[in-house]
UniProtKB/Swiss-Prot annotation:
GO terms for molecular function: ATP binding; ATP hydrolysis activity; ATP-dependent protein folding chaperone; protein dimerization activity; unfolded protein binding; zinc ion binding. Signal peptide: none annotated. It comes from Phenylobacterium zucineum (strain HLK1). GO terms for cellular component: HslUV protease complex. This is ATP-dependent Clp protease ATP-binding subunit ClpX. One of its GO terms (biological process) is cell division. Keywords: ATP-binding, Chaperone, Metal-binding, Nucleotide-binding, Zinc. The keyword Chaperone applies.
């Protein structure tokens, strides 16, 4: 659509989709009575590419191949190549098993639930969420720390299946092919080596309660949630084909693994092991069932999680990529917020590195990146709507380190100053 700017000899053209003028964009393409800018064209291409990736060319089994699953995971999760490969193969095999369950009964394929082990903020939950989106199945996240044994204050394990059922709009058949992610599973480790001291209702007791639904049982789920009572009607959900992914940071597990691998050596030639010599993620790759047993998981629970995927620590380079590259990257989100005020936002390269360093120092991983950016931009976002003529805000390393305020560039006078 064409709009005339008052006082101009020529009419100014505007994008029919985003409303930006021809002076604000690189290119404006004309069509019959409409115009579209290069930015909107790029956005449309992103949407088409995304839909094309999600609606896969399926393998002959009707399930995305491991490589196709991996390609989509790469769009959302930076790094973690080993974990992506393990998860892609496990999920492909799981849904291939479901599709072939009724075709040939000679060999019964067992369910392979997955255990994700990795430091906090490395992408465990995001990986599970993305997998569910790729396969297009119901997905729910449960917090293991809120679960207790039946009969005690807290959530019953059946509430996990209720959440999955709600995610499937109470379609039982769809829910029975869904994915459940149980977070903080390391927090339900056995609290004491001696089980006779006291009843461990939130540790070993929860592990025992989870065994049946993870292996496969017909769970009686109260539709409204809450505790069961005799007069209540129940929905019957078969958990045999539900894929369970358990995740946790497993703080301290690396010491158990290192102690097993060190052995004993003495003499002048003996190598003295430095605990900081290897990154936590590297040590996790050597995990064995015995290590998880020593950590506090019971043998039966470990047996229900045959596939183990370990995640690596995120270094500075990986954190900078997380800030800028994914479709929903934090920097892109803040740039879009500032665009809504018609203001540009620029982070210098050294600023991004400073954010990454601060996240590593705090040991929060990718989870801490947003809070760092929020703290840095808080004053600017507070004052910005009241400013006139601001064209751009620039953030450098000094701003991230707290030694300066963001640089504010004005459109007309090009004045520079700090945010109040």
């Amino acid at each position: 659509m064409t709009k005339a700017a008052s006082g101009d000899s020529k009419s100014t053209l505007y994008c029919s989709f985003c409303g930006k003028s021809q002076h604000e964009v690189r290119k404006l393409i004309a069509g019959p009575t409409v115009f579209i800018c290069d930015e909107c064209v790029e956005l449309c291409m992103d949407i088409i590419r995304e839909e094309h990736k999600i609606s896969f060319v399926k393998s002959k089994d009707g399930v995305p191949t491991p490589k196709e699953i991996r390609e989509v995971l790469d769009d959302y999760v930076i790094g973690q190549d080993h974990a992506k490969k393990v998860l892609s193969v496990a999920v492909h095999n799981h849904y291939k098993r479901l599709n072939h369950a009724t075709k040939n009964n000679d060999v019964e394929l067992g369910k392979a639930n997955i255990l994700l082990i990795g430091p906090t903020g490395t992408g465990k939950t995001l990986l599970a969420q993305t997998l569910a989106r790729i396969i297009d199945v119901p997905f729910t996240v449960a917090d293991a720390t809120t679960l207790t044994e039946a009969g005690y204050v807290g959530e019953d394990v059946e509430n996990i299946i209720l959440k999955l059922l709600q995610a499937a709009d109470y379609n039982v058949e769809r829910a029975q092919r869904g994915i459940v992610y149980i977070d903080e599973v390391d927090k339900i480790s056995r609290k004491s080596d001696n089980p006779s001291i006291t009843r461990d209702v939130s540790g070993e007791g929860v592990q025992q309660a989870l065994l049946k639904i993870m292996e496969g049982t017909v769970a009686s789920v109260p539709p409204q949630g809450g505790r069961k009572h005799p007069q209540q009607e129940f929905l019957q959900v078969d958990t045999t084909n539900i894929l369970f992914i358990c995740g946790g940071a497993f703080a301290g597990l690396e010491k158990i693994i290192s102690a097993r691998g060190q052995g004993t050596s003495i003499g002048f030639g003996a190598k003295v092991a430095d605990p900081d010599e290897r990154r936590t993620g590297e040590i996790f790759r050597q995990v064995e069932p015995d290590d998880l047993l020593r950590f506090g998981l019971i043998p039966e629970f470990i047996g229900r999680l045959p596939v183990i995927a370990t995640l690596d620590d995120l270094d500075e380079k990986a954190l900078v990529k997380i800030l800028t590259e994914p479709k929903n990257a934090f920097v892109k989100q803040y740039v879009r917020l500032f665009e809504m005020e018609n203001v540009g936002l620029t982070f210098t390269e050294d600023a991004l590195m400073a954010v990454a360093r601060k996240a590593i120092q705090r040991k929060t991983g990718a989870r801490g990146l947003r809070s760092i950016l929020e703290g840095v931009l808080l004053d600017t976002m507070y004052e910005l709507p009241t400013y006139d003529g601001v064209e751009e805000v620039v953030v450098n390393a000094e701003v991230i380190e707290g030694r300066a305020q963001p640089l504010i560039i004005y459109a007309e006078r090009r004045d520079k100053g700090g945010a109040a």
